[in-house]
Curated annotation (Swiss-Prot):
<dbReference type="Pfam" id="PF13393">
    <property type="entry name" value="tRNA-synt_His"/>
</dbReference>
<comment type="pathway">
    <text>Amino-acid biosynthesis; L-histidine biosynthesis; L-histidine from 5-phospho-alpha-D-ribose 1-diphosphate: step 1/9.</text>
</comment>
<comment type="similarity">
    <text>Belongs to the class-II aminoacyl-tRNA synthetase family. HisZ subfamily.</text>
</comment>
<dbReference type="InterPro" id="IPR004517">
    <property type="entry name" value="HisZ"/>
</dbReference>
<comment type="function">
    <text>Required for the first step of histidine biosynthesis. May allow the feedback regulation of ATP phosphoribosyltransferase activity by histidine.</text>
</comment>
<keyword id="KW-0368">Histidine biosynthesis</keyword>
<dbReference type="GO" id="GO:0005737">
    <property type="term" value="C:cytoplasm"/>
</dbReference>
<dbReference type="InterPro" id="IPR004516">
    <property type="entry name" value="HisRS/HisZ"/>
</dbReference>
<dbReference type="InterPro" id="IPR041715">
    <property type="entry name" value="HisRS-like_core"/>
</dbReference>
<keyword id="KW-0963">Cytoplasm</keyword>
<dbReference type="InterPro" id="IPR045864">
    <property type="entry name" value="aa-tRNA-synth_II/BPL/LPL"/>
</dbReference>
<protein>
    <recommendedName>
        <fullName>ATP phosphoribosyltransferase regulatory subunit</fullName>
    </recommendedName>
</protein>
<keyword id="KW-0028">Amino-acid biosynthesis</keyword>
<comment type="subunit">
    <text>Heteromultimer composed of HisG and HisZ subunits.</text>
</comment>
<dbReference type="GO" id="GO:0000105">
    <property type="term" value="P:L-histidine biosynthetic process"/>
</dbReference>
Length: 395
């Protein structure tokens, strides 16, 4: 690499400079305090793990997004975490082994071999919360409400939420007895809302099942979609009706709690189909081409760690949250400039001021008083006899 290129960073990898880094850290603390006030306990997961542990219970998408290296000590393949959610699921299932509901939260950098979308970061700061041990819609309502509280804290404007339930499609596909290949083809067609392909792929199915699978293309829109789904899926198998009832219950409770929140339903939206097992949700804002927070239910993941537990949760990118949020983040400003001196009384005064939460910057040898302004100091310590006093910095 030429000397002139040594400062270049890989595509999608960025450094965060002051004061933006300070804003991100303040926001991180505020959000984690919010999570704690809801009863969520903070956990820290490893940046790198053996690959089989890191990808256990996850879909192929995570495998493709994971940077892989060889451990020089063991010779085994390792991966840098691309998603913290499976790691937290392992903590709940294998390490904590609690019997009742468990609420956990996290915040940390992740690394993506491939970005989520064109021009997006490959080094986001993932932040999220997970609720384990309860399979009821109440848990889904709780984590969605917490996610919305987080967005309110950050003052993200014009939030819209998408809701769906992968159990509706999964139940219909199982009832139809689709092969793995055909199910994947139908899944892809539904994501693109390619009705002609959906019709062709369901042509050999019983008419009632074919009609219900085709209906998923059109069942998208406002609250009226759920009423239409009740009519068009009335003859569906019991698991499908149970999934629809869960989605209805969640939607009603969210509408009551957040009456101003626009809700959009898409029963053909199968985000995370190979990973999620129930309700799926995502938050969008105008002008941003991808979701800014997302989550859902994933009840099967704990089984891969020896203990299946109901689970639901969400995640977001803290950098995106700070960028889009309009909440005023007040950063500490000003400080006290201290001259370069070995005076013992000065050192005691500096220690006392720092213990009180004051920002104190001591001059280094050769630094002039003019450097105080560059260090964002607005006061200085001046010696009066044997004592040092804090005085305004001369302009």
């Amino acid at each position: 690499m030429a000397t002139v290129d040594r400062w270049l960073l890989p595509d999608g990898i960025e450094e965060v400079l002051p004061p933006e880094a300070a804003c991100i850290e303040v926001a991180r603390r505020q959000v984690l305090d919010l999570f704690q006030s809801w009863g969520y306990e903070f956990v820290v997961t490893p940046h790198i793990e053996y690959l089989e542990s890191l990808l256990t219970g996850a879909g192929s998408d995570l495998d493709l997004r994971t940077f892989k290296v060889i451990d020089p000590q063991s010779g085994r393949q390792m991966g840098f975490r691309a998603d913290i959610t499976p790691q937290v699921a392992r903590i709940d299932a294998h390490t904590l082994k609690r019997e009742g509901p468990s609420r956990l939260c996290y915040a940390g950098s992740v690394l993506h071999a491939q970005p989520r979308a064109l021009s997006s970061s490959r080094s986001p700061i993932q932040l999220g919360a997970e609720l384990y041990g309860d399979a009821s819609p109440s848990s889904d309502v709780e984590v969605i409400s917490l996610m919305l509280a987080m967005l309110q804290l950050a003052d993200v404007p014009d939030v819209h939420m998408d809701l769906g339930h992968v159990g509706i499609y999964r139940g219909l596909a199982r009832a139809a007895g689709l092969s793995g290949e055909v199910e994947q083809q139908l899944f892809d067609a539904l994501q693109r809302k390619a009705i002609d392909e959906v019709v062709a792929l369901t042509a050999d199915l019983p008419q009632e099942l074919a009609s219900m699978l085709r209906a998923l293309v059109d069942l998208c829109g406002g609250r009226e979609v759920l009423d239409a789904a009740r009519d068009r899926l009335a003859g569906a198998p019991a698991p499908v009706l149970a999934a629809l009832n869960d989605l209805l219950a969640i939607a009603e409770r969210l509408a009551a709690r957040f009456p101003q929140l626009p809700l959009y339903f898409d029963l053909g939206e199968l985000r995370g189909y190979h990973y999620h097992t129930g309700v799926v949700f995502a938050v969008f804002v105008p002008g941003v081409g991808q979701s800014i927070a997302q989550g859902g239910r994933y009840d099967d993941i704990g089984a891969d760690f020896g203990r299946a537990r109901p689970a639901t949760g969400f995640s977001t990118d803290l950098k995106t949250l700070v960028t889009l949020g309009q909440a005023e983040i007040v950063l500490p400003s000003g400080g006290i400039w201290v001259p370069d001196s070995t005076d013992a009384a000065l050192w005691q005064q500096v220690c006392q001021l720092r213990s009180e939460g004051q920002r104190v910057v001591q001059a280094l040898p050769g630094q002039q008083a003019s450097a105080a302004r560059e260090a964002d100091c607005d006061r200085q310590l001046i010696q009066h006899g044997e004592h040092w006093q804090v005085m305004p910095l001369a302009s």
